[in-house]
Amino acid sequence: MAGAPDERRRGPAAGEQLQQQHVSCQVFPERLAQGNPQQGFFSSFFTSNQKCQLRLLKTLETNPYVKLLLDAMKHSGCAVNKDRHFSCEDCNGNVSGGFDASTSQIVLCQNNIHNQAHMNRVVTHELIHAFDHCRAHVDWFTNIRHLACSEVRAANLSGDCSLVNEIFRLHFGLKQHHQTCVRDRATLSILAVRNISKEVAKKAVDEVFESCFNDHEPFGRIPHNKTYARYAHRDFENRDRYYSNI
């Protein structure tokens, strides 16, 4: 992101750069070795790309989760630009999106995002990663605990584990079901981008779960639905007004 930590600090070592490129190209084949998406001359005319761009625009303009995250990014010195920081591309497998830390860019998988609700969740999820990238020096590629923490936060705060989504997945439960969902979704997200065993991914999630599950920034609470997200956005705006008057 503009002014993001990777642009303010010294760049990664050569070995880490190679690992970044390898991970990005495995999941996002349109990423070049330099970390930039390929742009064909007629790419903007493909139907899937047009739909992706329109859904993204609607999400950025109307979704309360995303509007709060955009304000929080700007407040932290990492203002988001639609054309610079989002890219609609075809992706491998069933991946819906990802945050490419090497370019501070969110990749939206136009071949796997098929409706507006899905776009809303993916953009929210990836913006949480971008927010973490902005506010802290996250070692995405060599520290599995850092990745696990951000995945726990994204699963917890993006609405991915909402009751509606879990019913749609035919997952039912009562006691601590939200926590179980967050653990499961975080583990799956790690496995989607790392060639490691499920046991290693689960262990990383377990090690960071308590502290990262209880880190609700910038929402200040778990936004279980859009109403909660609107309240959180209102409180975030009021918090800014309060501190500006001190």
Swiss-Prot record:
Record-linked InterPro entries: Peptidase_M76_ATP23
- Classification via PROSITE patterns: ZINC_PROTEASE (PS00142)
Q: Please name the Pfam families in this protein's record.
A: Peptidase_M76
Recorded GO molecular functions are:
DNA-dependent protein kinase activity; metal ion binding; metalloendopeptidase activity
Any one GO cellular component localisation term in the record: cell junction
* EC nos: 3.4.24.-
Q: Where does a divalent metal cation bind?
A: 125, 129
Keywords on record: Hydrolase, Metal-binding, Metalloprotease, Protease
Kindly list the biological process annotations in GO that this record carries: double-strand break repair via nonhomologous end joining; mitochondrial protein processing; mitochondrial proton-transporting ATP synthase complex assembly
Q: Which residues form the active site?
A: 126
Disulfides per UniProt:
none
Self-association state and partner proteins as the record states: Interacts with XRCC6.
Q: Which family does it belong to?
A: Belongs to the peptidase M76 family.
Q: What is this protein called?
A: Mitochondrial inner membrane protease ATP23 homolog
Which organism encodes this protein?
Answer: Homo sapiens
Q: What gene is behind this protein?
A: ATP23
